């Protein structure tokens, strides 16, 4: 409800009159009461709401993904005319969007599945918007979407037509998967700085403030520096009293499931999903900590050197995560005939969304130099960073393993990097085993 309200207020602030409807009369009345003088027109029946709109109607749905979206669409259909446009701005599974697009197209309606990133504040002030559906329908809503979207530093709106049917929601799903990876990498950096150097919260905030001035400059690093020094009403550091169980809404899982369907090695992001799952086993972990032995973390010898190694490992890990994510976008584009523009996608992530970061421009640059590049690690800038930073990543992972600090995404990053650069892998033995017990046959070199 908050996302819908904030998007309505965002649209209204651009000079539009906005019809609003919620199943709950009270919620509709509440929005109107809280926003006196705004050009928000309340409606209390679906019929009245639909009939208030000029044709072709442009209806933005912000409902919980799943059955709720289908029932909302079903309630609208009796009152729609051919050519009307429904925009689904929820966190919808892309296969559902493909299905709804097909069904609504058959009835003569347009359906635009749209990823919206930036949270409640982004919805109000300017989100990153990822629309997919009929191109001609997108053209009819593009002026509004461009006005309400976030603006990058160069003034460009963070919205672009992504592709047919489920393309927009797919890109939003991968965005969320990358977000999982970014957050877990940062959490592991935090664990290393606490475990290896016993940094205080103030020192952590100072370190992250410095990191945010350079290559790692991003929304997530920026908010993390603030989180470290936030105190509760008792004067305790808030982060230190928050239970170490990370919840999830399932979008990271969807990204990993899709990687398995496509045969894409999305190892880092998938490890970040698993890390949340193992965090939720709190009671088991507490019990296991009293039974299972392991090394006690020994302090790192050189403080400044260790901090720099962790910074480099974090940046290279981030690059590997995005390389995997964009490789999966390419596989999905081929599978679903979307013709995705990867440089354009990186561009619309530059502002408004949770993964906004300075280095996204480097991704756009890489695709502008070579649109057909198979993997971002092969682009000159990212190859150079890998050359320079891989030793730090290796050292940090080795330190973590020796000292019993779990770093699943850092470990996944170096394993993927080494696998990807290996001309020969031991998979020949696996294939021989498969042929031995199942006559699966094999190819000769």
Swiss-Prot record:
<dbReference type="InterPro" id="IPR006184">
    <property type="entry name" value="6PGdom_BS"/>
</dbReference>
<feature type="active site" description="Proton donor">
    <location>
        <position position="179"/>
    </location>
</feature>
<feature type="binding site" description="in other chain">
    <location>
        <position position="249"/>
    </location>
    <ligand>
        <name>substrate</name>
    </ligand>
</feature>
<keyword id="KW-0521">NADP</keyword>
<dbReference type="InterPro" id="IPR006115">
    <property type="entry name" value="6PGDH_NADP-bd"/>
</dbReference>
<feature type="binding site">
    <location>
        <position position="91"/>
    </location>
    <ligand>
        <name>NADP(+)</name>
    </ligand>
</feature>
<dbReference type="InterPro" id="IPR006114">
    <property type="entry name" value="6PGDH_C"/>
</dbReference>
<dbReference type="InterPro" id="IPR006113">
    <property type="entry name" value="6PGDH_Gnd/GntZ"/>
</dbReference>
<dbReference type="InterPro" id="IPR008927">
    <property type="entry name" value="6-PGluconate_DH-like_C_sf"/>
</dbReference>
<feature type="binding site">
    <location>
        <begin position="22"/>
        <end position="24"/>
    </location>
    <ligand>
        <name>NADP(+)</name>
    </ligand>
</feature>
<feature type="binding site" description="in other chain">
    <location>
        <position position="91"/>
    </location>
    <ligand>
        <name>substrate</name>
    </ligand>
</feature>
<dbReference type="GO" id="GO:0016054">
    <property type="term" value="P:organic acid catabolic process"/>
</dbReference>
<feature type="binding site">
    <location>
        <position position="434"/>
    </location>
    <ligand>
        <name>substrate</name>
    </ligand>
</feature>
<feature type="binding site" description="in other chain">
    <location>
        <position position="180"/>
    </location>
    <ligand>
        <name>substrate</name>
    </ligand>
</feature>
<dbReference type="GO" id="GO:0019521">
    <property type="term" value="P:D-gluconate metabolic process"/>
</dbReference>
<comment type="subunit">
    <text>Homodimer.</text>
</comment>
<feature type="binding site">
    <location>
        <position position="440"/>
    </location>
    <ligand>
        <name>substrate</name>
    </ligand>
</feature>
<feature type="binding site">
    <location>
        <begin position="1"/>
        <end position="4"/>
    </location>
    <ligand>
        <name>NADP(+)</name>
    </ligand>
</feature>
<dbReference type="GO" id="GO:0006098">
    <property type="term" value="P:pentose-phosphate shunt"/>
</dbReference>
<dbReference type="InterPro" id="IPR006183">
    <property type="entry name" value="Pgluconate_DH"/>
</dbReference>
<feature type="binding site" description="in other chain">
    <location>
        <begin position="175"/>
        <end position="176"/>
    </location>
    <ligand>
        <name>substrate</name>
    </ligand>
</feature>
<dbReference type="Pfam" id="PF03446">
    <property type="entry name" value="NAD_binding_2"/>
</dbReference>
<keyword id="KW-0570">Pentose shunt</keyword>
<comment type="function">
    <text>Catalyzes the oxidative decarboxylation of 6-phosphogluconate to ribulose 5-phosphate and CO(2), with concomitant reduction of NADP to NADPH.</text>
</comment>
<feature type="active site" description="Proton acceptor">
    <location>
        <position position="172"/>
    </location>
</feature>
<protein>
    <recommendedName>
        <fullName>6-phosphogluconate dehydrogenase, decarboxylating</fullName>
        <ecNumber>1.1.1.44</ecNumber>
    </recommendedName>
</protein>
<keyword id="KW-0311">Gluconate utilization</keyword>
<feature type="binding site" description="in other chain">
    <location>
        <position position="276"/>
    </location>
    <ligand>
        <name>substrate</name>
    </ligand>
</feature>
<keyword id="KW-0560">Oxidoreductase</keyword>
<feature type="binding site">
    <location>
        <begin position="63"/>
        <end position="65"/>
    </location>
    <ligand>
        <name>NADP(+)</name>
    </ligand>
</feature>
<dbReference type="InterPro" id="IPR036291">
    <property type="entry name" value="NAD(P)-bd_dom_sf"/>
</dbReference>
<dbReference type="InterPro" id="IPR013328">
    <property type="entry name" value="6PGD_dom2"/>
</dbReference>
<feature type="binding site" description="in other chain">
    <location>
        <begin position="117"/>
        <end position="119"/>
    </location>
    <ligand>
        <name>substrate</name>
    </ligand>
</feature>
<dbReference type="GO" id="GO:0004616">
    <property type="term" value="F:phosphogluconate dehydrogenase (decarboxylating) activity"/>
</dbReference>
<dbReference type="Pfam" id="PF00393">
    <property type="entry name" value="6PGD"/>
</dbReference>
<comment type="pathway">
    <text>Carbohydrate degradation; pentose phosphate pathway; D-ribulose 5-phosphate from D-glucose 6-phosphate (oxidative stage): step 3/3.</text>
</comment>
<comment type="similarity">
    <text>Belongs to the 6-phosphogluconate dehydrogenase family.</text>
</comment>
<dbReference type="GO" id="GO:0050661">
    <property type="term" value="F:NADP binding"/>
</dbReference>
